[in-house]
């Protein structure tokens, strides 16, 4: 992580990495995502699926495991340095979904993975020896373009350090009404307009949501990958059922396993060129 990236992430609570995926990587991931999204429910492999009646967003379960072109994104070389710094070389892949957002979907209301009154709880964001550490964060791999005015991901910059709970109706009053359309970006809110092949990194502490998707001829598709640290449990103990695990390669299996604090995973030892798996 460069000093500029570290400062921006600490200041705002997110990073927008541009043109992370190569042309070939993006094309393969787009093709795989399209197969999953357009697949009839009766053809879904075991443990795959989605709540097609959800009003604000469709999330296809275990998206990264659907195809190898999506699976390799979980440890893409361009994001690896960020995984290493945020987890202090102790990464655990603990969740994911393939997101699909179309015209007609409702506003995805603001939310976060923590509450200020619970600080630090089990989800922590802190600085250690000049490095950013975060025990729970997400990466958004964009498979389609988002332009200003389209809608999509919104966040409250700096909210990862908030000391007060957000008033529920602040920024988007009336959001709980059934016919509510949220398509504005009021002061204090940022709309992330990423292009296909970009990646957005965001601690789960950050308050975020999604504007109503406006284009009728285009949708928003993205792979969400969630990481925490290997020695802490902030979600399910076993988030991936056997039918999903059987599809994964050994490196991914190692990434999803819990691990002792004082031992580095094999993939970390190999990629970081460490002499020993013993962690200090």
Go through the PLM ranges and name each one.
Residues 1-12, 18-129:
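Non-heme Fe(II)-dependent double-stranded beta-helix
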Residues 66-72, 126-127, 180-190, 209-212:
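Active-site rim elements
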Residues 22-23, 98-101, 105, 145-148, ...:
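Short, solvent-exposed loop/turn segments at secondary-structure junctions
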Residues 57, 112-124, 172-188, 217-219, ...:
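Short, surface-exposed loop/helix-turn segments at secondary-structure junctions
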Residues 132-136, 146-207:
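Double-stranded beta-helix
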Residues 96-98, 139-141, 223-227:
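A structural signal for short, well-ordered beta-strand segments
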Residues 105-112, 119-122, 149-158, 164-168, ...:
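A short secondary-structure junction signal
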Residues 43, 169-171, 199-201, 205-280:
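Non-heme Fe(II)/2-oxoglutarate
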